[in-house]
Regions:
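RNA pseudouridine synthases
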Residues: 1-267
């Protein structure tokens, strides 16, 4: 992957790269397995740049972890360019391999797609969602882009079906911490990290509410913990009090997302 720049002010190449968001690790990788080219000549980070110099940054080629075993299965692709891939994930699928589910993750499915489409790329999941939550996932096509995305605010909107009749709208402001009795679950705790969830009820039928949810913070299991906390657990979420005989996963979906693309323009899906 290559990025091109025109220099506006004299400065050292290393300084310029740092200003563009290249981390020390990325710069080190470029030195060993990439290239820095100024006006057609290969240079080092100590090169003194002048106004109007043309700089090419060739990122280091990445190698996928041996733990990622690619497999081919049709992806639900919502958006793709040379920098990012945005897909819709099914429920019952991890974003990345875990101790309990070592293979058939979304990352491995995407790696299979890249190989099938002859893209020598390692996927970097930007917006992870829980195994049994479905919906939109953003993927960076290089670690550098993943690094840039870490500093970009992403607006995510979810849909869920929960038990009981929710109020027409509201905000749940309750801090969340790890459950000391579990390595998986979280709980509302006054000593936890701030967590704020905004919701709007869209429909109510037969003791079930359909809600649209916006996260103002991004804690692990935030929606699930908050809805349990107010007495309206998500249908199918047996981990947080919403077990249901007809649904074996929580009825929770990330269905809308928007953010400023790190290279191009606004993305809204």
């Amino acid at each position: 992957m290559q990025f091109n720049y025109t220099i506006r002010n004299p400065q050292m190449l290393r300084t310029f790269l740092q200003e563009q968001g290249y981390s020390k690790n990325t710069i080190s990788a470029i030195k060993h397995n990439g290239a820095l080219i100024v006006n057609g000549q290969t240079e080092t980070v100590r090169k003194q740049l002048q106004k109007d110099d043309k700089v090419e940054v060739h990122l280091a080629q990445e190698t996928a972890s041996h733990n990622l075993i690619p497999f081919e299965k049709t992806l639900n692709i919502l958006y793709e360019d040379e920098y990012l891939l945005i897909v819709s994930k099914e429920a019952y699928q991890n974003c990345a391999p875990s101790r309990e589910h070592k293979h058939f993750s979304l990352a491995e499915q995407i790696l299979g797609y890249f190989k099938q489409s002859r893209q020598n790329i390692v996927p970097h999941i930007v917006t992870r969602i829980d195994r049994n939550t479905s919906g939109i996932v953003v993927v960076a096509k290089h670690g550098f882009l993943h690094h840039l995305m870490a500093n970009i605010h992403i607006d995510k909107t979810y849909l869920c079906v929960c038990f009981g009749e929710m109020k027409a709208h509201g905000i749940i402001d309750a801090p969340i911490a790890r459950d000391p009795a579990s390595i998986i679950t979280r709980q509302v705790n006054p000593h936890g990290k701030q967590a704020i969830t905004k919701y709007r009820r869209l429909d109510y039928i037969s003791n079930y509410s359909l809600c649209e949810i916006t996260l103002l913070t991004g804690r692990t299991h935030q929606i699930r913990v908050h809805f349990q906390h107010i007495g309206h657990p998500i249908v199918g979420d047996d981990l947080y009090g919403g077990g249901h005989s007809c649904y074996k996963h929580q009825l929770l979906r990330c269905f809308k997302i928007s953010f400023m693309h790190p290279i191009l323009s606004l993305i809204h899906i």
